[in-house]
């Protein structure tokens, strides 16, 4: 989901340019890795994932005017109120996102895909983009 979210932020013209996957003996999957994506405007996303690491689901957007960070995205439980911090030079401001229920939203999205053909077509396109990114990751990381 790291690449899917980065693709959403960078836009559909983003390309995967580096990928590294690492395994641990005794497991049949890649346990951790990293990737770099870039869009046509030269905006870069650096991604890392790991199933053998301390749990994190962070995002940091770093630009010339400041930085936005959030320590809990995409997997927050129902009712959890995530925060984000805006940093400009050495000034920090922490704000809250409204509590949400990501699991319920995913079920509602699934139902909407079943009931609405336009939503379904849009979701197919998003899934195809994600499939292409995963295949490119495997190619760059030399995963069979």
Which role fits each region the language model picked out?
Residues 59, 77-89:
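Short polybasic amphipathic segments
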Residues 40, 109-144:
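C-terminal helix-rich "cap/oligomerization" subdomain common to oxidoreductases
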Residues 2-3, 81, 104-108, 134-135:
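A general structural signal for well-ordered alpha-helical segments in protein cores
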Residues 78, 94-108:
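Active-site loop of classical SDR/Rossmann-like NAD(P)-dependent oxidoreductases
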Residues 28, 99-103, 120-127:
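Aromatic-acidic/polar surface patches that form glycan- and anion
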Residues 15, 81-85, 94:
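Ser/Thr- (and often Asn-) enriched beta-sheet segments in non-cytosolic proteins
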Residues 2-76, 107-118:
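Contiguous beta-strand/loop segments that form the cofactor/metal-binding neighborhood of enzyme cores
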Residues 37-41, 84-91:
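Short acidic, glycine-rich loop/turn motifs
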């Amino acid at each position: 989901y790291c690449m899917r979210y980065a693709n959403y932020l960078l836009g559909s013209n983003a390309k995967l340019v580096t990928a590294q996957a690492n395994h641990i003996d005794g497991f049949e999957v890649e346990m951790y890795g990293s990737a770099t994506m870039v869009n046509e405007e030269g905006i870069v996303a650096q991604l890392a994932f790991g199933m053998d690491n301390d749990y994190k689901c962070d995002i940091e957007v770093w630009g010339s005017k400041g930085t936005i960070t959030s320590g809990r995205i995409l997997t927050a439980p129902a009712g959890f109120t995530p925060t984000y911090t805006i940093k400009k030079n050495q000034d920090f401001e922490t704000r809250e996102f409204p509590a949400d229920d990501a699991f319920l939203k995913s079920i509602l999205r699934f139902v909407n895909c079943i009931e609405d053909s336009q939503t379904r077509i849009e979701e197919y396109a998003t899934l195809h983009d994600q499939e292409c990114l995963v295949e490119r990751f495997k190619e760059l990381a030399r995963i069979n």
